C-alpha cells in the first residue's frame, strides 16, 4: 500500500509505516518483523496473536471500539478520484455512476451504508480485494470513479503517470493508527502513542513522512482532528 507499506525492488518491506514502526518500536526496546497478511483476515490474526498489531494506513474512524488503538499518528483524507476529463466535479455528480472501492475499507463502508447525505444514489458500487484493480478499471473507463486514501491515489498517479483528478471535497478526514487486540493487556498501545508524540516533537515523524510525501506537516496535524 504505497507510500505506507510496500516491497522495494529487492523485495524488502519499506514505506512510511515501515520506517515509523521500526523507529518507534526500537525506542520501546523491540525489533520489528513485518508480516504481509490477507487484509480481510486482519482482525482474526491480531485477536489470535498471530500478529501483534495491525499497521498499514489503518483508519480509526468508526473502528474505535473494535481495537485498542495507538495514535492517531497521521491524518488521512479519503477521497474520490475520476479521470481528468470526467464531468464529475462534486460528490453530488456521482448520481447514477459506477464506483469501485477496495473491500473492507472506509470508502466501501461509506458507499454501501448510504447514510452520508452528501452522496446521491449511485448506479453501482463494486468492491475488489486488490487495490490495483481499482486504478486499472478507472484508467480503462470501466468505472466512473474510485475512492481511496488520497496519498495512495497520488502515489499511483506519480508512479504510473495516470491522468486522474481528485475531487476537492473529501469523503472523510480521519486519523490513522495502529490497532491491537482488545484482549491485549501489555500496554503497548499506550506506550506507542507516547512514542508517537515524542517522535512528532523531535521532528522524526516529519523527517520520515517527508521522505515519501511533499508537505509532510499537513499529514501530522493530528491534534486538529475532532475527538
Q: What are these regions, as identified by a protein language model?
A:
Residues 15, 29, 48, 64, ...:
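Extracytoplasmic
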Residues 6-7, 21-30, 107-128, 157-161:
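Ligand-binding cleft/hinge of the Venus flytrap
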Residues 1-57, 65, 127, 191-192, ...:
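Extracytoplasmic small-molecule ligand-binding "clamshell" domains
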Residues 18-27, 88, 92-106, 178-216:
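Extended ligand-binding regions for polar small-molecule ligands
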Residues 41-44, 57-66, 110-113, 137-139, ...:
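A ligand-binding cleft/hinge motif common to bilobed small-molecule-binding domains
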Residues 41-42, 87, 106-107, 133, ...:
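Alpha-helix capping/helix-boundary segments
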Residues 75-82, 154, 158-197, 215-227:
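Periplasmic-binding protein-like
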Residues 1, 9-12, 58-60, 83-87, ...:
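Short coil/turn segments
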Amino acid at each position: 500500500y504505497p507510500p505506507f507499506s510496500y516491497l522495494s525492488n529487492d523485495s524488502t518491506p519499506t514505506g512510511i509505516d515501515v520506517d515509523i514502526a521500526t523507529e518507534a518500536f526500537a525506542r520501546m526496546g523491540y525489533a520489528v518483523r513485518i508480516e504481509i497478511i490477507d487484509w480481510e483476515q486482519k482482525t482474526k490474526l491480531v485477536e489470535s496473536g498471530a500478529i501483534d498489531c495491525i499497521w498499514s494506513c489503518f483508519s480509526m474512524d468508526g473502528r474505535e471500539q473494535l481495537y485498542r488503538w495507538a495514535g492517531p499518528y497521521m491524518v488521512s483524507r479519503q477521497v474520490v478520484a475520476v479521470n481528468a476529463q470526467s464531468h464529475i466535479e462534486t460528490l453530488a455528480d456521482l448520481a447514477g455512476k459506477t464506483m469501485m472501492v477496495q473491500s473492507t475499507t472506509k470508502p466501501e463502508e461509506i458507499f454501501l451504508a448510504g447514510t452520508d447525505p452528501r452522496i446521491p444514489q449511485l448506479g453501482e458500487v463494486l468492491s475488489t480485494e486488490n487495490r490495483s484493480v481499482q486504478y486499472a478499471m478507472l484508467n480503462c473507463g470501466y468505472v466512473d470513479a474510485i475512492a481511496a486514501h488520497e496519498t495512495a491515489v497520488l502515489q499511483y498517479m506519480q508512479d504510473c503517470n495516470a491522468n486522474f483528478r481528485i475531487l476537492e471535497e473529501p469523503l472523510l478526514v480521519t486519523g490513522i493508527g495502529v490497532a491491537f487486540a482488545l484482549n491485549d493487556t501489555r500496554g503497548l498501545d499506550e506506550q506507542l502513542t507516547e512514542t508517537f508524540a515524542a517522535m512528532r516533537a523531535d521532528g522524526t515523524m516529519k523527517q520520515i513522512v517527508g521522505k515519501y510525501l511533499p508537505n509532510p506537516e499537513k499529514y501530522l496535524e493530528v491534534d486538529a482532528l475532532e475527538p
